[in-house]
């Protein structure tokens, strides 16, 4: 059954985000009500250094089915933005992709660590930078079809140098590039990492909306 969402321009003011106000409600509130699924059984089948995997038995209405679920503590991803509108990205080898990828700096949250603290820590550890300002731009699920990992995206400005502190298995190259060039690399297919594409596009959209289409000095 298809449910038609209301037109943004008619039903309410536009807001660049997953949920947007529509007469005091969100767009998702207009979709037909669906019963909350219930987990009736869950078995852990793998425990790793970063994540665990369970097989969950789920009841949704009259249907009962199983899903493999990756349990992950969540991550912070950062776009470090300099006054000349360049951003700092990292080039690193990703074995599942069997190639080097250009990515926004990011990392898994440590035990009981807030996303903002995690973002500040990763920025300093990976790039050797400290941010005078960390602004939360968005939060999103990475791959909700099988993984519960959530990412928090921060825009880092008012940057100053600190000391890089990489883990033994972290071999990265820091790449400084203009935001406009990074956006062109997305269009050309040269940036292939989903979180980085999301982060750069949301950063560009945020800056343009605040400055009448022009990238600001920060």
Feature map (PLM): residue ranges:
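Conserved Nudix-box catalytic region and its N-terminal flanking loop in Nudix hydrolases
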Residues: 36, 70-72, 76-121, 138, ...
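Compositionally biased, intrinsically disordered low-complexity segments enriched in Pro/Arg/Gln/His
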Residues: 6-11
């Amino acid at each position: 059954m298809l449910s038609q969402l209301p037109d943004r321009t008619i039903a309410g003011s536009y807001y660049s985000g997953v949920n947007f106000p529509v007469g005091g409600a969100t767009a998702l509130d207009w979709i037909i009500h669906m019963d909350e699924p219930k987990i009736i059984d869950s078995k852990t089948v793998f425990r790793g250094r970063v994540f665990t995997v369970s097989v969950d038995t789920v009841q949704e209405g009259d249907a009962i089915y199983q899903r493999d679920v990756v349990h992950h503590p969540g991550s912070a991803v950062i776009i470090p933005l300099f006054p000349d509108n360049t951003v700092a990205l990292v080039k690193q080898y990703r074995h599942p992709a069997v190639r080097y990828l250009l990515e926004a700096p990011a990392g898994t949250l440590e035990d009981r660590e807030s996303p903002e603290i995690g973002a500040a820590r990763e920025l300093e550890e990976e790039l050797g930078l400290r941010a005078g300002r960390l602004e939360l731009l968005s939060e999103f699920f990475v791959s909700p079809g099988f993984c519960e990992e959530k990412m928090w995206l921060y825009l880092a400005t008012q940057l100053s140098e600190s000391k890089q502190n990489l883990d033994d298995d972290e071999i990265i190259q820091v790449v400084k590039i203009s935001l406009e060039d990074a956006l062109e690399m997305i269009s050309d297919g040269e940036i292939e990492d989903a979180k980085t594409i999301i982060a750069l596009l949301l950063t560009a959209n945020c800056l343009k909306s605040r400055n009448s289409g022009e990238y600001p000095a920060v």
